[in-house]
Amino acid sequence: MDFKKKPIKKKSITVAYFYEHLSSRLSIKLKKLNQVDEEKRKIYERDIHRPGLALAGFTNLFTYRRVQVFGNTETWFLNHLGTEERKQAFSNITRYKVPCIIVTNNNKLDPELVEMATEAGIPLYRTSHTTTKFIYLITDFLDDQFCHYQHYHGSMVDVYGVGMFITGRSGIGKSEVALDLIERGHRLVADDLVVITRKGESVLMASGTELVRHFMEIRGLGIIDVEAMFGIRAIRHQKRVEIVVELLEFEPGKEFDRTGLENKSVDILGVEVPLVQLPIYPGKNITVIAEVVALNYLLKHYGYDAAEEFDRRIQQQIATRATVNNPAQRAVEYFEHDFE
């Protein structure tokens, strides 16, 4: 499996898309203060900007391509200026092609400023949320929109709460293993085409595409609808990628890890994810092994590593036998424990 694909990132989203999804996905109600074409305005960055310095006249480093938020400070600053000074300060914003302006805390803008924004084609909104809460709410949404992502072939399943991405060459049986896991009570995230998105520094989230989400292709059978067949308990919309299981064809003479002391990983979008490579051949129960992989991951997560514990016992046994077979050491132990 090639995980070295170049990450994809959205270049922009329209203000119309931003407004619609804040309402539908986050239940954030924005009141429109003017009527302009929101499709023509685009947001290019995920960060938020409060343009206090720009209103004061310092626009050398004005990040106008971001969503502009007017909190109490910006609103009160404008309201305490004279009419002409207020217009001049606001024109420092409107002369740039800013995506939109959002006024928080139900603050009000002078009607003349609303008219200036309308003439400049800048959408104006108002929200009852405080500035801090509003920025917190929309930052996560914008992070989702502008984060890096890529499409990978495989099956993503939630196994005992562990996000397992099953990969391997075409036709090796990834979908069949995923289907068997679903039948045993685990949950499908996506099959065949999996969208993996990087959030923050070290979190990878997997989901399916809108078209094929929760559908599976089983060779010889065709397309099946997992949700319709197994019910809502058999699916979930997204899951964190926590371990990658690569299915490999068994090759006589090829060495595979037999102790678990060798910790392999794979780089996905700049994040290292634990990798388990499983050789397969007819009759081998990969589904049960996949469940054990998930349980073993949970044990390691909570501080217990079976391979390390087994290695420790072997080392302890070797040390004990070395002591028993050393005549000088046996003599010392004899006299130290001589109670006659």
From Swiss-Prot:
For this UniProt record, the keywords arranged alphabetically read as follows: ATP-binding, Kinase, Magnesium, Metal-binding, Multifunctional enzyme, Nucleotide-binding, Serine/threonine-protein kinase, Transferase
Leader sequence range is: none
Q: Name one GO biological process term.
A: regulation of carbohydrate metabolic process
Which GO molecular function terms does the record list? ATP binding; magnesium ion binding; phosphorelay sensor kinase activity; protein serine/threonine kinase activity; protein serine/threonine/tyrosine kinase activity
Tell me which Pfam families the record gives: Hpr_kinase_C (PF07475), Hpr_kinase_N (PF02603)
Gene3D superfamilies xrefs: HprK N-terminal domain-like, P-loop containing nucleotide triphosphate hydrolases
> Can you tell me which residues form the catalytic site?
153, 174, 192 (proton acceptor), 258
Show the segment(s) annotated as Important for the catalytic mechanism of dephosphorylation: 279-284
Give the enzyme's EC designation.
2.7.11.-, 2.7.4.-
Which cofactors, if any, are listed as required?
Mg(2+)
Question: Which amino acid positions bind ATP, per UniProt?
Answer: 168-175
Establish whether keyword ATP-binding is in the entry.
Answer: yes
Presence of the UniProt keyword RNA-binding in the record: no
Against InterPro entries, the record matches this protein to: HPr(Ser)_kin/Pase, Hpr_kin/Pase_C, Hpr_kin/Pase_Hpr_N, P-loop_NTPase, Ser_kin/Pase_Hpr-like_N_sf
| Ranges for region Important for the catalytic mechanism of both phosphorylation and dephosphorylation | 216-225
Domain of life where this protein originates: Bacteria
Tell me what reaction this enzyme catalyses: [HPr protein]-L-serine + ATP = [HPr protein]-O-phospho-L-serine + ADP + H(+); [HPr protein]-O-phospho-L-serine + phosphate + H(+) = [HPr protein]-L-serine + diphosphate
Listed binding positions for Mg(2+) are 175, 217
Annotated family? Belongs to the HPrK/P family.
Miscellaneous comment? Both phosphorylation and phosphorolysis are carried out by the same active site and suggest a common mechanism for both reactions.
According to the record's subunit comment, the protein's assembly and interactions are: Homohexamer.
Task: Read off the domain note.
Answer: The Walker A ATP-binding motif also binds Pi and PPi.
Q: Describe the task this protein carries out.
A: Catalyzes the ATP- as well as the pyrophosphate-dependent phosphorylation of a specific serine residue in HPr, a phosphocarrier protein of the phosphoenolpyruvate-dependent sugar phosphotransferase system (PTS). HprK/P also catalyzes the pyrophosphate-producing, inorganic phosphate-dependent dephosphorylation (phosphorolysis) of seryl-phosphorylated HPr (P-Ser-HPr).
Q: What protein is this chain from? A: HPr kinase/phosphorylase
Q: Which organism is it from?
A: Chloroherpeton thalassium (strain ATCC 35110 / GB-78)
